[in-house]
Amino acid sequence: MKLSRRSFMKANAVAAAAAAAGLSVPGVARAVVGQQEAIKWDKAPCRFCGTGCGVLVGTQQGRVVACQGDPDAPVNRGLNCIKGYFLPKIMYGKDRLTQPLLRMKNGKYDKEGEFTPITWDQAFDVMEEKFKTALKEKGPESIGMFGSGQWTIWEGYAASKLFKAGFRSNNIDPNARHCMASAVVGFMRTFGMDEPMGCYDDIEQADAFVLWGSNMAEMHPILWSRITNRRLSNQNVTVAVLSTYQHRSFELADNGIIFTPQSDLVILNYIANYIIQNNAINQDFFSKHVNLRKGATDIGYGLRPTHPLEKAAKNPGSDASEPMSFEDYKAFVAEYTLEKTAEMTGVPKDQLEQLAQLYADPNKKVISYWTMGFNQHTRGVWANNLVYNLHLLTGKISQPGCGPFSLTGQPSACGTAREVGTFAHRLPADMVVTNEKHRDICEKKWNIPSGTIPAKIGLHAVAQDRALKDGKLNVYWTMCTNNMQAGPNINEERMPGWRDPRNFIIVSDPYPTVSALAADLILPTAMWVEKEGAYGNAERRTQFWRQQVQAPGEAKSDLWQLVQFSRRFKTEEVWPEELLAKKPELRGKTLYEVLYATPEVSKFPLSELAEDQLNDESHELGFYLQKGLFEEYAWFGRGHGHDLAPFDDYHKARGLRWPVVNGKETQWRYSEGNDPYVKAGEGYKFYGKPDGKAVIFALPFEPAAEAPDEEYDLWLSTGRVLEHWHTGSMTRRVPELHRAFPEAVLFIHPLDAKARDLRRGDKVKVVSRRGEVISIVETRGRNRPPQGLVYMPFFDAAQLVNKLTLDATDPLSKETDFKKCAVKLEKV
């Protein structure tokens, strides 16, 4: 029976109504019910942002055909955002890649050749030759990988093992460097451990919400719906929103604050001063659980050492700090008076006071939320530290309804990039490569020679671009990311290195993205439920899903690619003789045998999979690969405050928030009665620090790396929109989402447009010192910049806004500031 969509919907409604009324079902409707019953449903976390919504995935005849919010998922409680409802369509774009493609001319690889289909063996042959040549001629520092906060946990773990242990290169970094690195360093400096202490359950218990550089209405809409429900159902609840431009979150705001870019640092210090001046410090908490330190200043902007701003900095890249007294701290913040703050920020005094009163009121439970406005900031780590100051001064932390909460943008920026440690300086469970004890722990667990993991921090994301351009990094593999579009300063610092004939670039992706088309070799990748996976969301919730369909054609998961490629290398080809002498039994073995097919990883048999359960990688290898990798990885955190539950528990649950101890998850860390690591009588214990105390930092305002001047007279801020996710490589292939927002526009204040003889809908050339793009003027709509600032989303591959942005970073976190550079406009 063939049914039109309209007939299907009508019959479906008839069937539902008849069933509810206890009536017999008409024949057509019975056929629909039969079709519905043929759909197989299973759970998965959403593929998009870091909220971690649970969805039910419907599959039929080997395809994902439906998706709905999971009513049993505690995060979203059955709701999806607009992107979540269209998840099935992200995998079925017309240009889905299904076989490897190599640039070739006259039957062999050529940097200027045309993309030509090849086999996986041919792809690995070329990769093997390029990797081995680079390793032999220039050593491990000449190869690198750029990964993703969209990797599954075991993909990130496998990649980290391959590079740090196998190839002995720490030149592996995730795209989370561009979004969450400042949050990581902020957590580590203040608390000694990464990730939030609270959870989403705080929303229903809070009295006030303060958004710092976070448009949750569009970027975290499900959480925003919970905040909206809390605000509208309780007249005593307050919402404050701070941003450099007006956006949809302002619609709910009781106090909507627009401030001059970079001056959020001033506001944060003003609030600390207000708390002290109004005797609002929680003295009991403060005296027992807090230390005070003064941080180094004038630390530069993470630009090339030859840049004038770096040469002028007194303490470039310094994260040094020294103890200070309370009286000295009080004097430090006293400079940030109401009058000075209003003048520097452009915010009216009454709005500043209203905001400060929320934090100072001992009867108000306050949650601070932030995302990229704080993190993508040349002083992003400082901004994180300064908001923690407010909660530590008042004791509004680690308790229901209270706390600072860094929201994440990718589905596993926490679970993979941060917890697994796929950053160039990190190892699992907050360990770092510079710590000999940490390296020793990993080397012993992985049964590799002592000294295998390099002590030198590898190249971070922006440094990788520079090293490619300079010819120091010659073989570069990117996975699950579209950095040619998403990263900063495309013209000056990225494209030159990618197209340099000295370098060989590999991109693993499901679609021909801007990055893929700039590469030399494209590897087709399995997506989402085409593989078994695990993500970790913003509230420390680890969630699993099973493979539910097979990938099209020859597309393979990132995990398969990493593991199979490791077979191409024997230990003596990648390790020096002095290492092999320490473990001669590893001589002659492949990296596959040493890293993945070990007794530790391969001990879980295929019989642990359900009889009809898809798992392409495990069935090919003969053991349950994902379980082996996860259990080995989870060992690092157990007993150290990062406890993950046993593997099988996650397939039964809708996620669990670590630390999971004795089968119980943790909602609030660091507080007695909530955290199993805090003993009776301790009250609070920030056990990431040796003395159990968190740190309040004295850190000043410092200006942005680039600000408007007479020629480049406007601030440019970049970001996202509700309908698209990051570079749009998935969402722009969903017809409904593409139609809803088909191309990027330049949001501009009407008076700024008028002064330049521009009208809504006009084409306009946006020009910075680094490049130019053509966009379309938008003087109305959802985003309303103040005079002097324009906003442009980065999802549109036809309008590469990152040709304009500056590659200035926070010197401590190495995270790029995408929110502040100077541009001018020219009418087209």
From Swiss-Prot:
Its main location: periplasm. It is an enzyme of class 1 (oxidoreductase). Keywords: 4Fe-4S, Electron transport, Iron, Iron-sulfur, Metal-binding, Molybdenum, Nitrate assimilation, Oxidoreductase, Periplasm, Signal, Transport. It catalyses: 2 Fe(II)-[cytochrome] + nitrate + 2 H(+) = 2 Fe(III)-[cytochrome] + nitrite + H2O. Mo-bis(molybdopterin guanine dinucleotide) binds at residues 83, 150, 175, 179, 212-219, 243-247, 262-264, 372, 376, 482, 508-509, 531, 558, 718-727, 802, 819. GO terms for molecular function: 4 iron, 4 sulfur cluster binding; electron transfer activity; iron ion binding; molybdenum ion binding; molybdopterin cofactor binding; nitrate reductase (cytochrome) activity. SUPFAM superfamilies: ADC-like, Formate dehydrogenase/DMSO reductase, domains 1-3. It comes from the Bacteria. GO terms for biological process: cellular respiration; Mo-molybdopterin cofactor biosynthetic process; nitrate assimilation. InterPro entries: Asp_de-COase-like_dom_sf (IPR009010), CT_Nitrate-R-NapA-like (IPR041957), MoPterin_dinucl-bd_dom (IPR006657), Mopterin_OxRdtase (IPR006656), Mopterin_OxRdtase_4Fe-4S_dom (IPR006963), MopterinOxRdtase_cofactor_BS (IPR027467), Periplasm_NO3_reductase_lsu (IPR010051), Prok_molybdopt-oxidoreductase (IPR050123). It is found in: Periplasm. Substrate binds at F794. Catalytic subunit of the periplasmic nitrate reductase complex NapAB. Receives electrons from NapB and catalyzes the reduction of nitrate to nitrite. Component of the periplasmic nitrate reductase NapAB complex composed of NapA and NapB. NCBIfam families: NAPA, PRK13532.1, TAT_signal_seq. Belongs to the prokaryotic molybdopterin-containing oxidoreductase family. NasA/NapA/NarB subfamily. This is Periplasmic nitrate reductase. The lineage of its organism: Bacteria, Pseudomonadati, Pseudomonadota, Gammaproteobacteria, Enterobacterales. The gene is napA.
